[in-house]
UniProtKB/Swiss-Prot annotation:
Anthranilate 1 binds at residues 80, 111. The keyword Nucleotidyltransferase does not apply. Anthranilate 2 binds at residue 166. This is Anthranilate phosphoribosyltransferase. Its cofactor is Mg(2+). Belongs to the anthranilate phosphoribosyltransferase family. The lineage of its organism: Bacteria, Bacillati, Bacillota, Bacilli, Bacillales. Homodimer. SUPFAM superfamilies: Nucleoside phosphorylase/phosphoribosyltransferase catalytic domain, Nucleoside phosphorylase/phosphoribosyltransferase N-terminal domain. GO terms for molecular function: anthranilate phosphoribosyltransferase activity; magnesium ion binding. Mg(2+) 1 binds at residues 92, 226.
């Protein structure tokens, strides 16, 4: 089958959802060779992956994922594609802490850094959160603390078959888009950061067909894979079986413009230090505001706010009152941390 698909892609043709799902089954089962995988994802990248191909690959990847038994109503994931090259701190991870402190169940799906300076796993480890929790431990954490981290390599072990080709070719491929679409806990609410508006549209269509309840796919100014504080944010909103697009600025939700430089870091340790500063009452205002902005958008996505501006208000109050900082400390005091905040 792989030879047929490769020839089809060589001719510039795209794959149907069914074909893409079958190809992913070949890849996940280890039946496709490394050279076949590299050739396929390179041709798809050059041509441009379609929404149907993204959907089929996501279905195939979900079928091979380790199942997460706990299903808590209203669970959300704050996840991004990475790859924006802007070197910002882990905004979606900080936003997840805000949400959990407010009682929203968050199943944070992520990995160590691949294309960024600090992956979600890297910064959580610095903050003292257990990233290597077993499935049972993660379930318990979600139920008792509202937050668990689903370390991608533990749940998507079949992805080992593409690790070599991805590393060797070194550029973004369809696999960069799949992580946010394959949350093991089946989170039907998402705030999903995407580095490119066109990719966000395709991923939004895939999420719609995968049964997302309500998701916001956001692309900030300069391709930031978060809601931006330094410019406008493009949104693909998936809700009620439809995809809609719009833009908004920080001013539209009651926040001033901030400087990109105030939210950039070089290492996971710097990212963790900035997150601690934000929640303890220090840190640049732009950093506080971008966390409130993204947490506010997530509160809207999971139905805990009637619009983004209202969510920003709730998130800002949680940060300013140090509710989030106390929550972070409580995670460690309960023995689930490995460092002190």
């Amino acid at each position: 089958m792989m030879k047929h698909v490769l020839n089809k892609c060589l001719m510039g043709e795209s794959l149907s959802v069914q074909e893409a799902e079958q190809v992913m089954e070949q890849i996940m089962s280890g039946r496709a060779t490394a050279s076949q995988v590299a050739s396929l994802i390179t041709m798809m990248r050059v041509r441009g992956e379609t929404a149907e191909e993204i959907l089929g690959f996501a279905k195939g990847m979900r079928a091979y994922a380790r199942k997460f038994p706990a299903v808590i109503e209203g669970t959300i994931d704050t996840c991004g594609t990475g790859g924006d090259g802007l070197g910002t701190f882990n905004i979606s991870t900080a936003s997840a802490l805000v949400l959990a402190s407010l009682g929203v169940p968050v199943a944070k799906h992520g990995n160590r850094s691949v294309s960024s300076k600090s992956g979600s796993a890297d910064v959580l480890e610095e903050l003292g959160i257990n990233i290597q929790a077993s499935v049972e431990e993660a379930c318990q954490m979600l139920e008792t603390t509202n937050l668990c981290f689903l370390f991608a390599p533990l749940y998507h072990q079949s992805m080992r078959h593409v690790a070599g080709p991805r590393k060797e070719i070194g550029f973004r491929t369809i696999f960069n888009l799949l992580g946010p679409l394959t949350n093991p806990a089946g989170a039907r609410y998402q705030l999903l950061g995407v580095y490119d508006e066109a990719a966000a549209l395709k991923m939004g269509e895939a999420l719609r067909q995968l049964g997302s309840e309500h998701s916001l796919l956001v692309t900030g100014a300069d391709g930031l894979d978060e809601c931006a504080i330094h410019g406008d944010t493009h949104v693909v909103e998936v809700k009620d079986g439809r995809c809609e697009t719009y833009r908004f600025s920080p001013d539209d939700v009651g926040l001033p413009l901030g400087n990109l430089a105030d939210i950039q870091v070089d290492t996971p340790a710097e990212s963790a230090a900035l997150i601690r500063a934000i929640f303890s009452g220090d840190g640049p205002q732009a950093a506080k505001n971008i966390v409130a902005l993204n947490a506010g958008a997530a509160l809207y996505a999971c139905g805990n706010a009637s619009h983004i501006a209202e969510g920003v208000h709730y998130a800002s109050k949680a940060i300013e009152s140090k509710r989030v900082f106390r929550y972070l400390q409580s995670l460690q005091q309960q023995g689930r941390g490995i460092k002190h905040a």
